Amino acid sequence: MSAQPVDIQIFGRSLRVNCPPEQRDALNQAADELNQRLQDLKVRTRVTNTEQLVFIAALNICYELAQEKVKTRDYAANMEQRIRMLQQTIEQALLEQGRISERAEPKFE
């Protein structure tokens, strides 16, 4: 289904954005989280300028996203390494099994 206009409140300001109906709940949750972050930042930094708070929050969110990307990349590399090790272990076990069964099979000629 196509995107539909949705009104959300961000730090006391109304904002209309287009959003697919199935993503409306996620959008509202994101707006709630942003509102909470802005409120926490306002209390913590004592900055009252909304624009400045939004920029600080955006920088914090971008930093957190960059950190998560690094963690995800590291995790994926670690999993690839583990999969390669498992493949090598399985291949080695199959080779060993093949050698054992070759010795154990009687040969009839």
Swiss-Prot record:
Q: Which domain of life is it from?
A: Bacteria
Per the record, the coiled-coil ranges are 21-99
What's in the keyword line of the UniProt record?
Cell cycle, Cell division, Coiled coil, Cytoplasm, Septation
GO biological-process terms attached to the record: division septum assembly; FtsZ-dependent cytokinesis; septin ring assembly
What compartments host this protein?
Answer: Cytoplasm
Q: Which GO terms describe its cellular component?
A: cell division site; cell septum; cytosol; plasma membrane
What is said about its interaction partners and assembly? Homodimer. Interacts with FtsZ.
Which family is annotated? Belongs to the ZapA family. Type 1 subfamily.
- Give a short account of what the protein does: Activator of cell division through the inhibition of FtsZ GTPase activity, therefore promoting FtsZ assembly into bundles of protofilaments necessary for the formation of the division Z ring. It is recruited early at mid-cell but it is not essential for cell division.
Q: What is this protein called?
A: Cell division protein ZapA
Please give the organism: Cronobacter sakazakii (strain ATCC BAA-894)
Q: Which gene encodes it?
A: zapA
